[in-house]
């Protein structure tokens, strides 16, 4: 990044120029909480709130034009709900400024940009730009330790000295969503597969068990309960096969 400065000296002088840059932080709302964090767990079918927070450089006022483009890549295991909203946080208040930010969604990438941030009313060097949206965890979600990372970065103007085409990018910032799988094998006493069973999985929510998923009796002897978050579960054999 560049800094605009004016300096007049009469003798040899050493000057340290501060090259300030904006920051970008991607977070996901913790399951069952209003707090945002770097990683959490959800079940398939749940809508997941995400938040992106951008700060501005200390020399923001020096820019005649300020390019500001956020790209957010959603993994294949999530379905975007087309509900992005953009907010201006300043002095303890929050204002919806979504009308200044055209949104596009192509190839799992959300692009959020006003073109020139200077056209957005009320933005100051102390402001934060906050973006929120939701995405639903779908059947293509990755199970286990790899998670389903959601990645964002910011392209921004980095030279206030007249070169409007000069830009840089923030490092990628990531929020990860984990989901899990439970596999049940129904067998006879001799460990042979036994078809015809039916199972219902319950999760404890607010001290009560709520039905999550049911497998009806059939020819299967193996049951996969995919896309589970952490918590207390109860598995009930709802259909008992003969044998």
Kindly give the residue locations of the regions a language model identified.
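Solvent-exposed loop/turn and edge beta-strand elements of beta-rich ligand-binding domains
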Residues: 1-243
């Amino acid at each position: 990044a560049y800094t605009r400065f004016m300096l007049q000296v009469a003798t040899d002088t050493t000057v340290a120029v501060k090259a300030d840059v904006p920051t970008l932080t991607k977070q996901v709302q913790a399951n069952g909480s209003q707090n945002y964090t770097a990683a959490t767990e959800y079940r398939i079918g749940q809508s997941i709130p995400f938040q992106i927070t951008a700060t501005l450089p200390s020399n923001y006022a020096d820019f005649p034009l300020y390019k500001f483009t956020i790209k957010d890549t959603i993994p294949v295991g999530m379905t975007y709900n087309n509900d992005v909203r953009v907010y201006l946080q300043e002095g303890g208040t929050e204002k919806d400024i979504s009308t200044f930010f055209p949104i596009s969604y192509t190839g799992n990438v959300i692009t959020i940009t006003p073109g020139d941030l200077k056209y957005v009313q009320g933005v100051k060097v102390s402001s934060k730009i906050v973006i929120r949206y939701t995405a639903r965890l779908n059947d293509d979600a990755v199970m286990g330790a790899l998670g389903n990372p959601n990645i964002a970065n910011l392209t921004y103007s980095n030279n206030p000295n007249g070169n409007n085409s000069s830009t840089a990018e923030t490092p990628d910032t990531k929020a990860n969503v984990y989901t899990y799988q439970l596999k049940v094998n129904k067998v006879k006493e001799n460990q042979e597969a036994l078809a015809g069973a039916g199972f219902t999985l319950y999760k404890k929510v607010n001290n009560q068990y709520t039905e999550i998923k049911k497998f009806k009796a059939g020819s299967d002897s193996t049951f996969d309960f995919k896309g589970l978050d952490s918590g207390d579960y109860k598995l009930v054999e709802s259909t008992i096969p003969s044998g």
